[in-house]
Amino acid sequence: MRTIDLNCDFGESFGVYRLGQEEILSYVTSVNIACGFHAGDPLVMRRTVQLAIQHGVAIGAHPGFPDLFGFGRRAMAVSPEEVYAYVVYQIGALAAFVKAEGGVMTHVKPHGALYNMAAKDAALAEAIAKAVHDVDPMLVLYGLSGSELIRAGRACGLRTASEVFADRTYQADGSLTPRSDPRAIIADEDEAVTQVLMMIRDRRVRSVQGTDVAIEADTVCLHGDNEQAVRFAKRLYQALQNEGIAIQAPRREERR
């Protein structure tokens, strides 16, 4: 039976600023928790880990650039050495909360500009993969399907999960359409569900240029920061079940 993971970025509040709907945890199988650089703070991280454990969803670190004002979505001129340190630091911070709450960390997914840059920059991708491997080689590395990050993870022996997006359009080279392009976001729920089913069943996606692009889909990213997102997550969850597609998170590699 074909299986798919549904993941969402979570714990992206900071101080009195609140972002995210807890209800979405009923319809996802893994969460990527902000680690304090682009969003999140120690109290938010602890509470988010507790929520994830209560709902039985897989817990992952969501490291980003140190850019609270830009929410980690602004590109930064950084070296691979800096990226390595950023990722190790953030995984370590979240891992401490996960351990304190009696949970298990399963994966790592970079955030925002770091994710997008590592999709195309082999040196940054290798730095991220090495950081994950050095902290815990049993962690699963999430990255854009067909990206340098997925290649780097596989090259260093990590298990990887190729990620696709329900509400984003694609370019002919398999990259995401930049948010600056008015065609970047899929607002129509029917269109988004159709795209997800095509990516899972047919292993392809229709680009904005009109060409079909081959794609691997191990995990689908959903956004959980508004009421509409919760409704869509429920709808997609039901559509996958109706198609006989099992919904489950990738498992950590067993220690040998």
UniProtKB/Swiss-Prot annotation:
Chain segments annotated as coiled-coil in the UniProt record: none
EC number of the protein: 3.5.2.9
Catalytic activity of the protein: 5-oxo-L-proline + ATP + 2 H2O = L-glutamate + ADP + phosphate + H(+)
CDD domains membership: LamB_YcsF_like
Gene Ontology molecular function: any one: ATP binding
Pfam families tied to this protein: LamB_YcsF
GO BP: any one term: carbohydrate metabolic process
Broadest EC class assigned to this enzyme: hydrolase
rRNA-binding found in the keyword field: no
Superkingdom, natural source: Bacteria
Keyword field: ATP-binding, Hydrolase, Nucleotide-binding
InterPro entries from the UniProt entry: Glyco_hydro/deAcase_b/a-brl, LamB/YcsF/PxpA-like
Family, as annotated: Belongs to the LamB/PxpA family.
Assembly information from the UniProt record: Forms a complex composed of PxpA, PxpB and PxpC.
Function: Catalyzes the cleavage of 5-oxoproline to form L-glutamate coupled to the hydrolysis of ATP to ADP and inorganic phosphate.
Protein name in UniProt: 5-oxoprolinase subunit A
